[in-house]
Amino acid sequence: MDSFRPHLAKVAGGLALDRAEARAAFDDLLSGEVTPVQAGAFLTALKVRGESVEEIVGAAEAMRARMTRVAAPENAVDVVGTGGDHSGSVNVSTLAAIVVAACGVPVAKHGNRAATSRSGAADVLAALGVRLGLDPAAQARCLDEAGLCFLFAQAHHPAMRHVAAVRSELPVRTIFNLLGPLSNPAGVGYQLFGVAQAALAEPLTRVLAELGSRRVWTVHGSDGLDEITVTGPTQVVALDEGRLCHFTIDPREFGLALRAPEELRGGDPADNARSLEAVLAGARNAYRDIAVLNAGAALVVAGAAQALADGVAQAQDAVDSGAARATLARLVRASNDHSNGQEGR
């Protein structure tokens, strides 16, 4: 494709694209007109040099322009991560999203099937009975009736099919592993955003600021988790209406004991679904602790809690009262009621 060649030449020469150039390059990639050789060379060159903030912003703009959007309340929040931590943990952000919704904050949870783990958000939700791949109208109804919807990435980003084969053949993660979490189909302005590499925390927070996010906590656990961890401290880069700050979260400050990494180990989707249901039924374990800590943070990000201690307390109450369990039941019911024969589990 002639329009793509200058962008490929620039990146292959070790130079960075500006925002407009990056958007144009990714417009071409997502159109399906770029050859597999060109796409592979471009993505690999970006990976080797390291993507700049402007390149990621431009790429995300191209991705967002092609996504299938879902209507959501202005205060909707997402709890999402880049993945790639290879921890094999339980589904933390999925349970945290359910708890946040039970606290009265609308959650548009964006996610996909597992890539580097045994159980992604889509996998565990399907095992719990949630219908996947709903159309935007059905998703909006789930959000209205359950306070929560699951935005199945492959259903909302059809243009990704044009780079799927190239990505599967490359031996490294590419910029597209970042673009999915940055491209919530509901256009949420509030995110609890996990990264598996500490070096990505500030750049991706700046990307989200450029893309219009209002309040974000980008988190990286000391154990490598793309979550707020309970095995040690977590580094946070926070965005609040254009201003960035850095701080550390220690779970012990919120009455949560430090846990061993093995206590967060998950299994296949069925195993993780049973673990999630056990927490909602009252189990007190490491999974509950990490879920309420992350849910509490999301409540602060969404403006529903003034401080993390308050957010954690709200999250604990939502679990203990049965509200979180009822929220999951409503999501299962709503997603099946409004599926209209769309993709199953």
Curated annotation (Swiss-Prot):
Anthranilate 1 binds at residues 81, 112. Its EC number is 2.4.2.18. It catalyses: N-(5-phospho-beta-D-ribosyl)anthranilate + diphosphate = 5-phospho-alpha-D-ribose 1-diphosphate + anthranilate. Belongs to the anthranilate phosphoribosyltransferase family. GO terms for biological process: L-tryptophan biosynthetic process. Anthranilate 2 binds at residue 167. It comes from the Bacteria. GO terms for molecular function: anthranilate phosphoribosyltransferase activity; magnesium ion binding. Mg(2+) 2 binds at residues 226-227. Mg(2+) 1 binds at residues 93, 227. GO terms for cellular component: cytosol. Binds 2 magnesium ions per monomer. HAMAP family: TrpD (MF_00211). Pathway: Amino-acid biosynthesis; L-tryptophan biosynthesis; L-tryptophan from chorismate: step 2/5. Its cofactor is Mg(2+). 5-phospho-alpha-D-ribose 1-diphosphate binds at residues 81, 84-85, 89, 91-94, 109-117, 121. Homodimer. This is Anthranilate phosphoribosyltransferase.
